């Protein structure tokens, strides 16, 4: 029986304009967004986040909250 190759998303982040995404590889910040993170998946639209560079979350080591449209990393 054939199986789907479903990616395991490891990183979660928000860009300057509020878009929250997950990706498979550690992305780099470029301009106002995250790039080069392998496969991506859209999660949610939030609010514009001037601190977007602080939103890169490694889901294997940290937790997060998404409140009032802003993604925040929570250290475990």
Enumerate the predicted regions with their spans.
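Amphipathic alpha-helical oligomerization segments
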Residues: 4-22
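Low-complexity intrinsically disordered segments
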Residues: 35-76
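Phosphate-interacting basic helix/loop segments used at nucleotide- and nucleic-acid interfaces
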Residues: 1
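Residues in intrinsically disordered, low-complexity segments of regulatory proteins
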Residues: 8-10, 33, 51
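Short, surface-exposed terminal/edge motifs of secreted or surface/virion proteins that either
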Residues: 18-29, 33
